[in-house]
């Protein structure tokens, strides 16, 4: 992401303007996850909408175009999966932020939020009590995720898979996720596994007390980068593996990268290749203590 402005500095002019984003601070070329792209709102007649109900939220999402800003106010109870299917552009992203999505009223097996579109900024949202995964990036790419909290979901809190690529996940927290139907075998804090595309990254995220692993990269056919993340107290229920960071699977030679991260008090390994080729994972400055099987198996 380039040319950022802080979310609080965005001013939306609804018609007849050449530029609809005023910048309070100088632009930066850094990939800062805590700021909204200045170019995300440079479409003339971009719409800024604040929503308070499921109906208005889903209408705003269904009609979203490049540059639009959707703000969730308060708590919205969802009765079905929220689907982000439209796409922004590299210079004019779609933005959704704020509030809590209570997914407890959804049918069994439902994801809380599904993202199949591309070029979204998704930030500052609490997603809770989804019957299955909290938020899934299923397809699409170039989505930017910041300060998302997922908890008490019936599977993984935040998952990237099925070809989804260049998803940048920053400053997110995932905890207390548990799949009761499988005695905790599958509910990770974060997962980027099975079939995700290239270029996916996690930075400054935390996973705590999930029934399976903190991070799960099982079977991923593309390298993943993890930087500055923390994984603690994972693994409970009869079937949870409880690794802090599971970095591959048997038969793979996948060159994931993990740096400056910590794993403590997980019932399995702190950091494990999980059958990935020995030496395939690039790592540095990994710390932690109190893991049931040890700190590093890479």
Region annotations inferred by a language model:
Residues 55, 75-78, 130, 141, ...:
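Short beta->alpha connector loops
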């Amino acid at each position: 992401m380039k040319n950022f402005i802080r979310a609080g500095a965005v001013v939306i002019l609804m018609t007849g303007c050449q530029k609809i984003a005023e910048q309070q601070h100088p632009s930066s070329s850094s990939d800062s996850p805590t700021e909204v792209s200045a170019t995300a709102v440079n479409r003339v007649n971009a719409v800024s909408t604040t929503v308070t109900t499921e109906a208005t939220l889903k209408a705003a999402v269904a009609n979203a175009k490049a540059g639009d800003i959707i703000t969730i106010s308060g708590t919205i109870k969802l009765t079905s999966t929220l689907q982000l299917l439209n796409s922004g552009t590299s210079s004019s992203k779609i933005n959704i932020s704020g509030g809590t999505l209570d997914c407890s009223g959804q049918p069994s097996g439902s994801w809380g939020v599904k993202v199949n579109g591309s070029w979204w900024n998704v930030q500052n949202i609490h997603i809770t009590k989804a019957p299955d995964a909290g938020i899934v990036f299923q397809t699409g790419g170039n989505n930017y995720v910041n300060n998302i909290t997922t908890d008490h979901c019936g599977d993984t809190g935040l998952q990237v898979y099925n070809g989804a690529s260049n998803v940048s996940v920053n400053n997110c927290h995932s905890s207390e996720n548990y799949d009761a139907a499988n005695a905790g075998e599958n509910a990770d804090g974060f997962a980027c596994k099975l079939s995700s595309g290239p270029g996916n990254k996690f930075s400054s995220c935390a996973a705590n007390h999930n029934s399976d692993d903190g991070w799960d990269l099982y079977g991923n056919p593309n390298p993943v980068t993890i930087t500055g993340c923390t994984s603690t107290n994972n693994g409970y229920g009869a079937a949870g593996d409880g690794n802090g960071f599971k970095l591959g699977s048997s038969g793979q030679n996948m060159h994931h990268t993990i740096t400056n991260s910590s794993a403590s008090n997980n019932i399995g390994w702190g950091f494990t290749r999980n059958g990935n080729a020995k030496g395939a994972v690039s790592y540095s400055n990994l710390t932690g203590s109190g893991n049931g099987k040890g700190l590093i198996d890479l």
